[in-house]
Amino acid sequence: MLDTKEKFSHLTVSLHWLVGVTIIALLAVGIYMEENEADALYLIHKSIGVLIFIAVLWRVIWRVRNGWPKPAGNYKKVERVLSKITHWILIIGTVLMPVSGMLMSGAGGHGFGIFGLELVAMNPDPLNPEEMIPLNQSLAELGHILHGAGGNLMILAILLHILGAFKHHLVDKDGTLRRMLGADIGR
């Protein structure tokens, strides 16, 4: 089933919440890891990041195939533009965050995988195995910059998205949030 103005498909709703909740959790864990040097969380963070990338690609393909959802109501032009910008940041960000993380980790010599299944091997220094030798320092730095800046931009876009959802639900009372929870707002 494709999305309609009144109802989103189960796939759209499921992918929205799976990707949204997971990205929020990964952002929170990422901030915690950075601020607390919680090295034990890197394996989990990277593994879930790689796995969610699969769902993100599925979601992007589904969105392209299905098209953008029609608004549940009539809104001012500024609201429509802000909504489009926010949604594009979220879509691009959900692709950019896993890609930049894999680039940072892989090119930085730290490798990554899925819960012990190595996808890109670590590159330890033979003289000091605790230290990693970057495979490409420039790409690792680019990944690091994109991951950090992308994370900050994603947090802002997520907050705008959540505020918009509450505005639709509490002020406009237009069914947008109920539709994303799976309801048919045409009934």
Regions found by a protein language model. Give the residues of each.
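Membrane-embedded alpha-helical bundles that constitute the cytochrome b-like, heme-associated redox core
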Residues: 1-187
